[in-house]
Amino acid sequence: MEPFVTMGLVLKETRYREADRILTILTPKLGVITAMAANSLRLKSKLFSACGLFCYSEFTLVPGRNMYTVREAEVQNIFHGVSSSIEGVSLAMYLTELAAALSPTGEEAARELRLVLNSLYMISEHRTDLRVIKAVFELRTMSECGFMPQIVCCRDCSTYDEGDAFYLDAQEGHLLCASCAAKAGKSCNLDKAALFALRHICLVEDKKIFAFKISVGSLAKLSAVAENYALTHLDKPLKSYAFLKSVLP
């Protein structure tokens, strides 16, 4: 079959044999794909840098029976700043594993790819709290993949933002005001600022998802809810999660 060119982000690399790598790549038109990068672990290989973890590269791929083969690869962005801290690396590993688990296979994933790239850029720039980046990615990814919570108003009384506390049900994805949460025997897990941020993350256009401010206290609530919501809807645990929590509790 004829080779073709695509942009792609390396979400995972697995050593195979002496110097080969099997790559999990997120692409804009084919979603998540698997590709063999032969001899890419050799320092003199032209594929060495472009096939590394978190590398955004231009790949020339040859279709195969079970996976693609990387014929050529040229680096576009390596996100150098990600590796400058253990917290940044652990978060990047978590986000890319989450993206690999939730992004489609064999169909368009341009928005998912853009979100991962933007998140890695934010990590590498060291200007935004890592907990904000994590919460934004979790909530936006779930929303993009069809798991957006029903956050416009209280499920039971339809109030929009009356009161100072709210409850988001991670399993069912619905919102309750403080009064309705009490009637249902639930303890509120969001304050008004955290709810505002949650709505912002899920509903605004892509280029504005990080454009909000939040206090430390409200961020703690948002972070807990975002993480619980994302992990509740995954089919299996993420291997990177325990490591992330050990360095970024």
What are these regions (language model features)?
Residues 1-249:
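Non-catalytic alpha-helical scaffolds and adjoining flexible linkers that form interface surfaces
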